[in-house]
């Protein structure tokens, strides 16, 4: 069972985003899709619904609503959480790293 989400360090999360996510994702409103979708407005949205991004059927069919907890669970092991996703990221195994990244994403994508 994945660890429960706990608010982390936004600053450490920003560093994690820059080193682990920025090559494929943007967070600002109106930001471009890259290899992965722009993440602005992701919280409260269902998986596979960022306008203008070509998702796999797996992402569209999963239908998960992104919350701090579901995002943390996903980031632990994306390919296990959504089998068939094209996200080529092995995941963040440490709950603290996931908490920090999700805390950053919650603010940066709002």
Curated annotation (Swiss-Prot):
So where does heme c get bound? 21, 24-25, 87
Gene Ontology BP, a term: mitochondrial electron transport, ubiquinol to cytochrome c
Query: What is a single Pfam family found in this protein's UniProt entry?
Result: Cytochrom_C
Record localization? Mitochondrion intermembrane space
MF-aspect GO terms: electron transfer activity; heme binding; metal ion binding
**PTM comment text:** Binds 1 heme c group covalently per subunit.
Q: What does this protein do?
A: Electron carrier protein. The oxidized form of the cytochrome c heme group can accept an electron from the heme group of the cytochrome c1 subunit of cytochrome reductase. Cytochrome c then transfers this electron to the cytochrome oxidase complex, the final protein carrier in the mitochondrial electron-transport chain.
- Listed name of the protein: Cytochrome c
Whichever gene encodes this chain, its name is: CYC1
